[in-house]
From Swiss-Prot:
Signal among keywords: yes
Name of this chain's protein: Probable mannan endo-1,4-beta-mannosidase A-2
Protein task: Endo-1,4-mannanase, a crucial enzyme for depolymerization of seed galactomannans and wood galactoglucomannans.
Record Gene3D superfamilies: Glycosidases
Pfam families referenced in this protein's UniProt entry, alphabetically: Cellulase
Organism: Aspergillus terreus (strain NIH 2624 / FGSC A1156)
GO CC terms, sorted: extracellular region
Entry keywords, A to Z: Carbohydrate metabolism, Glycoprotein, Glycosidase, Hydrolase, Secreted, Signal
Sites where the protein binds substrate: W99, N212, Y288, W351
Active site per database record: E213, E321
Highest taxon, organism lineage: Eukaryota
Length: 396
Protein backbone atom coordinates (compact mmCIF):
# COMPACT_ATOMS: atom_id res chain seq x y z
CA UNK A 1 0.00 0.00 0.00
CA UNK A 2 1.21 3.48 -0.83
CA UNK A 3 0.95 5.73 2.24
CA UNK A 4 1.94 9.38 2.66
CA UNK A 5 4.71 10.29 5.11
CA UNK A 6 2.53 13.19 6.26
CA UNK A 7 0.25 10.75 8.03
CA UNK A 8 2.81 10.17 10.74
CA UNK A 9 3.02 13.86 11.45
CA UNK A 10 -0.77 14.08 11.49
CA UNK A 11 -0.82 11.19 13.91
CA UNK A 12 1.60 13.03 16.20
CA UNK A 13 4.30 10.40 15.80
CA UNK A 14 7.05 11.78 13.61
CA UNK A 15 8.08 14.98 15.31
CA UNK A 16 8.21 14.12 19.01
CA UNK A 17 11.52 13.50 20.72
CA UNK A 18 12.70 10.04 21.60
CA UNK A 19 11.24 9.24 25.00
CA UNK A 20 9.45 6.44 26.74
CA UNK A 21 6.50 6.31 29.06
CA UNK A 22 8.74 4.19 31.29
CA UNK A 23 11.56 5.53 33.49
CA UNK A 24 14.88 5.86 31.70
CA UNK A 25 16.41 2.96 33.60
CA UNK A 26 13.52 0.76 32.54
CA UNK A 27 14.03 1.81 28.93
CA UNK A 28 17.67 0.84 29.12
CA UNK A 29 16.83 -2.50 30.71
CA UNK A 30 14.19 -3.14 28.04
CA UNK A 31 16.62 -2.40 25.24
CA UNK A 32 19.33 -4.55 26.81
CA UNK A 33 16.77 -7.31 27.20
CA UNK A 34 15.88 -6.92 23.54
CA UNK A 35 19.52 -7.25 22.60
CA UNK A 36 19.83 -10.37 24.70
CA UNK A 37 16.78 -11.95 23.12
CA UNK A 38 17.51 -10.82 19.60
CA UNK A 39 21.23 -11.49 19.55
CA UNK A 40 21.41 -14.12 22.29
CA UNK A 41 21.09 -17.20 20.15
CA UNK A 42 21.47 -20.07 22.61
CA UNK A 43 17.83 -20.76 23.42
CA UNK A 44 16.26 -23.18 20.97
CA UNK A 45 13.01 -21.85 19.51
CA UNK A 46 10.41 -23.03 17.06
CA UNK A 47 10.32 -20.65 14.13
CA UNK A 48 7.28 -20.08 11.91
CA UNK A 49 7.30 -22.31 8.85
CA UNK A 50 5.18 -23.81 6.10
CA UNK A 51 3.54 -27.22 6.30
CA UNK A 52 2.24 -28.13 2.88
CA UNK A 53 -0.22 -25.40 1.90
CA UNK A 54 -0.50 -24.05 5.45
CA UNK A 55 1.56 -22.09 7.94
CA UNK A 56 2.80 -23.38 11.28
CA UNK A 57 3.20 -20.98 14.21
CA UNK A 58 4.29 -22.09 17.69
CA UNK A 59 3.59 -25.69 16.75
CA UNK A 60 0.07 -24.96 15.49
CA UNK A 61 -0.67 -25.51 11.79
CA UNK A 62 -3.59 -23.70 10.19
CA UNK A 63 -4.98 -20.43 8.90
CA UNK A 64 -3.92 -17.21 10.67
CA UNK A 65 -5.32 -13.69 10.75
CA UNK A 66 -3.30 -10.51 11.12
CA UNK A 67 -2.89 -6.93 10.00
CA UNK A 68 -0.47 -4.28 8.76
CA UNK A 69 1.05 -1.34 10.63
CA UNK A 70 3.58 0.68 8.65
CA UNK A 71 3.96 3.13 11.56
CA UNK A 72 4.65 0.95 14.61
CA UNK A 73 8.43 0.96 14.13
CA UNK A 74 8.42 4.76 14.11
CA UNK A 75 6.67 5.13 17.47
CA UNK A 76 8.81 6.67 20.21
CA UNK A 77 6.79 5.52 23.20
CA UNK A 78 7.35 1.91 24.24
CA UNK A 79 4.00 1.81 26.02
CA UNK A 80 2.22 2.53 22.73
CA UNK A 81 3.98 -0.41 21.08
CA UNK A 82 3.01 -2.67 23.97
CA UNK A 83 -0.59 -1.47 23.78
CA UNK A 84 -0.89 -2.43 20.12
CA UNK A 85 0.48 -5.92 20.68
CA UNK A 86 -1.64 -6.46 23.78
CA UNK A 87 -4.79 -5.54 21.87
CA UNK A 88 -3.76 -7.76 18.96
CA UNK A 89 -3.15 -10.67 21.30
CA UNK A 90 -6.51 -10.21 23.02
CA UNK A 91 -8.23 -10.08 19.62
CA UNK A 92 -6.69 -13.27 18.27
CA UNK A 93 -4.58 -11.57 15.59
CA UNK A 94 -1.31 -13.45 15.15
CA UNK A 95 0.73 -11.70 12.44
CA UNK A 96 1.67 -8.05 11.98
CA UNK A 97 3.44 -6.78 8.87
CA UNK A 98 5.65 -3.78 9.63
CA UNK A 99 7.92 -1.46 7.69
CA UNK A 100 11.52 -2.51 8.27
CA UNK A 101 12.74 0.50 6.29
CA UNK A 102 12.73 4.26 6.78
CA UNK A 103 15.10 5.76 4.23
CA UNK A 104 16.06 9.44 3.98
CA UNK A 105 18.32 11.53 1.74
CA UNK A 106 18.98 14.23 4.34
CA UNK A 107 19.36 13.71 8.06
CA UNK A 108 16.11 14.68 9.82
CA UNK A 109 15.76 16.91 12.86
CA UNK A 110 16.66 15.42 16.22
CA UNK A 111 13.89 13.21 17.52
CA UNK A 112 12.60 12.03 14.14
CA UNK A 113 12.99 8.32 13.57
CA UNK A 114 14.99 7.24 10.51
CA UNK A 115 16.75 3.98 9.70
CA UNK A 116 19.08 4.69 6.78
CA UNK A 117 20.58 7.78 5.11
CA UNK A 118 21.48 7.73 1.40
CA UNK A 119 23.57 10.64 0.14
CA UNK A 120 26.33 11.23 -2.41
CA UNK A 121 26.73 7.59 -3.35
CA UNK A 122 26.98 6.26 0.20
CA UNK A 123 24.55 4.81 2.74
CA UNK A 124 24.64 5.11 6.53
CA UNK A 125 22.57 2.83 8.77
CA UNK A 126 21.21 4.43 11.94
CA UNK A 127 21.49 1.95 14.82
CA UNK A 128 20.86 4.61 17.46
CA UNK A 129 17.87 5.35 19.71
CA UNK A 130 16.14 7.25 16.87
CA UNK A 131 16.99 4.45 14.44
CA UNK A 132 16.86 0.68 14.47
CA UNK A 133 16.58 0.62 18.25
CA UNK A 134 12.94 1.55 17.69
CA UNK A 135 12.51 -1.57 15.56
CA UNK A 136 14.40 -3.51 18.24
CA UNK A 137 11.67 -2.64 20.71
CA UNK A 138 8.93 -3.70 18.29
CA UNK A 139 10.57 -7.12 17.96
CA UNK A 140 11.08 -7.33 21.73
CA UNK A 141 7.44 -6.50 22.46
CA UNK A 142 6.19 -8.87 19.77
CA UNK A 143 8.18 -11.67 21.40
CA UNK A 144 6.60 -10.96 24.78
CA UNK A 145 3.08 -10.87 23.35
CA UNK A 146 3.38 -13.87 21.03
CA UNK A 147 2.88 -11.83 17.84
CA UNK A 148 4.78 -12.72 14.65
CA UNK A 149 6.24 -10.05 12.35
CA UNK A 150 6.80 -9.73 8.63
CA UNK A 151 9.67 -7.27 8.19
CA UNK A 152 10.46 -5.80 4.78
CA UNK A 153 13.54 -3.95 3.58
CA UNK A 154 12.57 -1.30 1.00
CA UNK A 155 9.51 0.38 -0.48
CA UNK A 156 8.46 0.46 -4.12
CA UNK A 157 6.79 3.78 -3.34
CA UNK A 158 8.44 7.03 -2.29
CA UNK A 159 6.88 6.94 1.18
CA UNK A 160 9.62 6.58 3.81
CA UNK A 161 12.27 6.87 1.11
CA UNK A 162 11.80 3.78 -0.95
CA UNK A 163 13.68 2.84 -4.08
CA UNK A 164 13.69 6.50 -5.08
CA UNK A 165 15.92 7.38 -2.12
CA UNK A 166 18.58 5.03 -3.53
CA UNK A 167 18.16 6.51 -7.01
CA UNK A 168 18.59 10.04 -5.62
CA UNK A 169 21.85 9.14 -3.89
CA UNK A 170 23.44 6.79 -6.41
CA UNK A 171 22.02 8.03 -9.70
CA UNK A 172 19.31 6.40 -11.76
CA UNK A 173 15.90 7.08 -13.20
CA UNK A 174 13.82 3.94 -12.76
CA UNK A 175 13.17 0.89 -10.64
CA UNK A 176 14.99 -1.17 -13.24
CA UNK A 177 18.12 0.89 -12.53
CA UNK A 178 17.81 0.01 -8.85
CA UNK A 179 17.36 -3.71 -9.49
CA UNK A 180 20.36 -3.83 -11.83
CA UNK A 181 22.75 -1.39 -10.10
CA UNK A 182 25.65 -3.06 -8.30
CA UNK A 183 26.30 -0.09 -5.94
CA UNK A 184 22.63 0.23 -5.01
CA UNK A 185 22.21 -3.50 -4.50
CA UNK A 186 25.36 -3.55 -2.37
CA UNK A 187 23.87 -0.86 -0.09
CA UNK A 188 20.50 -2.62 -0.04
CA UNK A 189 22.12 -5.92 0.91
CA UNK A 190 24.20 -4.27 3.62
CA UNK A 191 20.97 -3.01 5.15
CA UNK A 192 19.39 -6.45 4.87
CA UNK A 193 22.40 -7.96 6.63
CA UNK A 194 22.17 -5.45 9.49
CA UNK A 195 18.46 -6.07 10.08
CA UNK A 196 18.62 -9.85 9.70
CA UNK A 197 21.61 -10.13 12.02
CA UNK A 198 19.77 -8.19 14.74
CA UNK A 199 16.81 -10.58 14.81
CA UNK A 200 18.22 -13.81 13.41
CA UNK A 201 17.39 -15.73 16.60
CA UNK A 202 14.04 -14.11 17.29
CA UNK A 203 10.96 -16.36 17.22
CA UNK A 204 8.90 -13.20 16.61
CA UNK A 205 10.00 -12.99 12.97
CA UNK A 206 7.43 -14.68 10.75
CA UNK A 207 9.27 -13.85 7.52
CA UNK A 208 11.72 -11.51 5.86
CA UNK A 209 10.23 -9.64 2.92
CA UNK A 210 12.19 -8.24 -0.01
CA UNK A 211 10.08 -5.11 -0.50
CA UNK A 212 6.68 -3.54 -0.17
CA UNK A 213 4.96 -4.10 -3.52
CA UNK A 214 8.01 -4.41 -5.81
CA UNK A 215 7.25 -3.37 -9.38
CA UNK A 216 9.16 -2.74 -12.58
CA UNK A 217 6.67 -1.11 -14.91
CA UNK A 218 7.27 -1.92 -18.57
CA UNK A 219 10.19 -4.24 -17.79
CA UNK A 220 10.58 -7.78 -18.99
CA UNK A 221 9.49 -10.07 -16.17
CA UNK A 222 13.01 -11.49 -16.06
CA UNK A 223 14.23 -8.30 -14.31
CA UNK A 224 12.10 -8.75 -11.19
CA UNK A 225 12.48 -12.52 -11.28
CA UNK A 226 16.29 -12.29 -11.30
CA UNK A 227 16.32 -9.72 -8.49
CA UNK A 228 13.93 -11.79 -6.36
CA UNK A 229 15.93 -14.96 -6.94
CA UNK A 230 19.30 -13.36 -6.11
CA UNK A 231 18.05 -11.40 -3.11
CA UNK A 232 16.10 -14.26 -1.54
CA UNK A 233 19.11 -16.54 -2.00
CA UNK A 234 21.27 -13.94 -0.25
CA UNK A 235 18.87 -13.70 2.70
CA UNK A 236 18.81 -17.48 3.01
CA UNK A 237 22.62 -17.46 3.08
CA UNK A 238 22.40 -15.22 6.16
CA UNK A 239 19.48 -16.91 7.88
CA UNK A 240 18.20 -20.41 7.23
CA UNK A 241 15.80 -20.34 10.19
CA UNK A 242 13.21 -17.85 8.96
CA UNK A 243 10.98 -17.79 5.91
CA UNK A 244 11.47 -15.39 3.00
CA UNK A 245 8.80 -13.87 0.77
CA UNK A 246 8.48 -11.11 -1.80
CA UNK A 247 5.82 -8.57 -0.76
CA UNK A 248 4.35 -8.68 -4.28
CA UNK A 249 0.81 -7.63 -5.12
CA UNK A 250 0.28 -10.78 -7.19
CA UNK A 251 0.36 -9.17 -10.64
CA UNK A 252 1.05 -11.28 -13.72
CA UNK A 253 -1.10 -14.40 -13.65
CA UNK A 254 -2.59 -16.42 -16.51
CA UNK A 255 -4.51 -18.83 -14.31
CA UNK A 256 -8.22 -17.88 -14.18
CA UNK A 257 -7.34 -14.54 -15.80
CA UNK A 258 -10.13 -12.31 -17.06
CA UNK A 259 -7.64 -10.08 -18.86
CA UNK A 260 -8.00 -7.19 -16.42
CA UNK A 261 -5.01 -5.01 -15.53
CA UNK A 262 -3.91 -6.87 -12.36
CA UNK A 263 -3.66 -10.19 -14.22
CA UNK A 264 -1.35 -8.68 -16.86
CA UNK A 265 2.44 -8.43 -16.81
CA UNK A 266 2.59 -4.66 -17.31
CA UNK A 267 4.09 -4.08 -13.82
CA UNK A 268 6.90 -6.55 -14.50
CA UNK A 269 5.71 -9.36 -12.24
CA UNK A 270 5.04 -13.00 -13.05
CA UNK A 271 3.39 -14.58 -10.05
CA UNK A 272 3.74 -18.18 -11.19
CA UNK A 273 7.44 -17.81 -11.96
CA UNK A 274 8.08 -16.17 -8.60
CA UNK A 275 6.48 -19.10 -6.79
CA UNK A 276 8.91 -21.45 -8.54
CA UNK A 277 11.95 -19.83 -6.88
CA UNK A 278 13.22 -22.31 -4.25
CA UNK A 279 14.28 -19.58 -1.80
CA UNK A 280 10.78 -18.06 -1.73
CA UNK A 281 8.83 -19.94 0.94
CA UNK A 282 5.35 -18.58 0.23
CA UNK A 283 3.57 -16.18 -2.07
CA UNK A 284 1.88 -12.87 -1.29
CA UNK A 285 -0.93 -10.96 -2.95
CA UNK A 286 -2.75 -7.69 -2.26
CA UNK A 287 -6.20 -6.41 -3.20
CA UNK A 288 -7.29 -2.81 -3.89
CA UNK A 289 -10.08 -2.84 -6.51
CA UNK A 290 -10.67 0.92 -6.40
CA UNK A 291 -6.99 1.59 -7.20
CA UNK A 292 -6.88 -1.02 -9.96
CA UNK A 293 -10.04 -0.12 -11.86
CA UNK A 294 -11.92 -3.27 -10.90
CA UNK A 295 -15.05 -3.93 -8.87
CA UNK A 296 -15.21 -5.07 -5.28
CA UNK A 297 -16.92 -8.31 -6.34
CA UNK A 298 -14.00 -8.96 -8.70
CA UNK A 299 -11.85 -9.33 -5.60
CA UNK A 300 -13.24 -12.81 -4.99
CA UNK A 301 -11.88 -14.00 -8.36
CA UNK A 302 -8.49 -12.49 -7.48
CA UNK A 303 -8.39 -14.43 -4.20
CA UNK A 304 -9.45 -17.71 -5.82
CA UNK A 305 -6.96 -17.37 -8.68
CA UNK A 306 -4.02 -16.92 -6.33
CA UNK A 307 -5.13 -19.80 -4.17
CA UNK A 308 -5.24 -22.02 -7.25
CA UNK A 309 -1.77 -20.90 -8.33
CA UNK A 310 -0.34 -21.63 -4.89
CA UNK A 311 -2.03 -25.01 -4.74
CA UNK A 312 -0.45 -25.88 -8.09
CA UNK A 313 2.97 -24.73 -6.83
CA UNK A 314 2.65 -26.56 -3.52
CA UNK A 315 3.27 -23.39 -1.50
CA UNK A 316 0.89 -21.42 0.73
CA UNK A 317 -0.26 -17.95 -0.14
CA UNK A 318 -0.69 -15.03 2.24
CA UNK A 319 -3.48 -12.57 1.46
CA UNK A 320 -1.14 -9.87 2.68
CA UNK A 321 -3.00 -6.58 2.13
CA UNK A 322 -6.59 -5.67 1.38
CA UNK A 323 -8.64 -2.62 2.10
CA UNK A 324 -11.29 -0.08 1.16
CA UNK A 325 -11.91 3.48 2.28
CA UNK A 326 -15.53 3.04 3.43
CA UNK A 327 -18.06 0.31 4.29
CA UNK A 328 -15.24 -1.92 5.52
CA UNK A 329 -17.44 -4.67 6.94
CA UNK A 330 -19.78 -4.92 3.96
CA UNK A 331 -17.04 -4.89 1.33
CA UNK A 332 -14.13 -6.73 2.98
CA UNK A 333 -16.06 -9.50 4.74
CA UNK A 334 -16.83 -11.33 1.43
CA UNK A 335 -13.11 -11.39 0.62
CA UNK A 336 -12.35 -12.90 4.01
CA UNK A 337 -15.05 -15.52 3.49
CA UNK A 338 -13.66 -16.40 0.06
CA UNK A 339 -10.12 -16.64 1.45
CA UNK A 340 -11.26 -19.07 4.15
CA UNK A 341 -12.85 -21.30 1.52
CA UNK A 342 -9.92 -21.18 -0.92
CA UNK A 343 -7.29 -23.91 -0.63
CA UNK A 344 -3.82 -22.43 -0.98
CA UNK A 345 -4.69 -19.21 0.87
CA UNK A 346 -3.57 -19.77 4.45
CA UNK A 347 -3.75 -16.39 6.13
CA UNK A 348 -4.85 -12.80 5.64
CA UNK A 349 -3.64 -9.41 6.89
CA UNK A 350 -6.04 -6.51 6.47
CA UNK A 351 -4.81 -2.97 5.76
CA UNK A 352 -4.54 -1.52 8.25
CA UNK A 353 -4.58 -1.74 12.04
CA UNK A 354 -5.71 1.30 14.02
CA UNK A 355 -5.57 2.03 17.75
CA UNK A 356 -5.73 4.91 20.22
CA UNK A 357 -2.20 5.79 21.31
CA UNK A 358 -0.84 8.21 23.90
CA UNK A 359 -0.75 10.85 21.14
CA UNK A 360 -4.28 10.10 19.91
CA UNK A 361 -5.51 7.90 17.06
CA UNK A 362 -2.84 6.11 15.05
CA UNK A 363 -2.43 7.25 11.42
CA UNK A 364 -5.42 6.76 9.12
CA UNK A 365 -4.68 6.55 5.41
CA UNK A 366 -8.37 6.07 4.65
CA UNK A 367 -8.27 2.28 4.84
CA UNK A 368 -7.75 2.09 8.60
CA UNK A 369 -10.29 0.80 11.08
CA UNK A 370 -9.74 0.95 14.81
CA UNK A 371 -9.61 -1.44 17.72
CA UNK A 372 -12.86 -1.51 19.67
CA UNK A 373 -15.13 -0.31 16.85
CA UNK A 374 -18.01 -2.15 15.17
CA UNK A 375 -15.85 -2.60 12.06
CA UNK A 376 -13.16 -4.22 14.19
CA UNK A 377 -15.73 -6.58 15.69
CA UNK A 378 -16.91 -7.55 12.20
CA UNK A 379 -13.57 -7.96 10.45
CA UNK A 380 -11.42 -9.13 13.36
CA UNK A 381 -13.44 -10.64 16.21
CA UNK A 382 -15.98 -12.37 13.96
CA UNK A 383 -13.28 -13.37 11.46
CA UNK A 384 -11.08 -14.95 14.14
CA UNK A 385 -14.13 -16.83 15.44
CA UNK A 386 -14.83 -18.11 11.91
CA UNK A 387 -11.22 -19.27 11.57
CA UNK A 388 -11.41 -21.10 14.90
CA UNK A 389 -14.64 -22.80 13.84
CA UNK A 390 -13.15 -23.78 10.48
CA UNK A 391 -10.00 -25.22 12.05
CA UNK A 392 -12.05 -27.05 14.67
CA UNK A 393 -13.88 -28.95 11.94
CA UNK A 394 -10.87 -29.22 9.60
CA UNK A 395 -12.67 -27.63 6.68
CA UNK A 396 -9.82 -25.65 5.08
Amino acid sequence: MKVPRLLLALGGLASIHIASALPQGAVERDMHATSAVVHGGNVKTKFPSTTGLKFTIDGETGYFAGSNSYWIGFLTNNADVDLVFQHMKESGLKILRVWGFNDVNTKPATGTVWYQLHANGTSTINTGPDGLQRLDYVVHSAERHGIKLIINFVNNWNDYGGINSYLQAYGGASNEDFYNSEPMQKAYRAYIKEVVSRYIDSPAVFAWELANEPRCKGCDTSVLHSWIEKTSRYIKSLDKKHMVTTGEEGFGLDLMSDGSYPFTYVEGGNFTDTLSIPTIDFGTFHLYPSSWGTTNDWGNLWVEAHGAACKAAGKPRLFEEYGVTADHCALEKPWQTTALKTKGVSGDLYWQYGDTLSTGPSPDDGNTFYYGTDEFDCLVSDHVAAIDEMEKHGRH
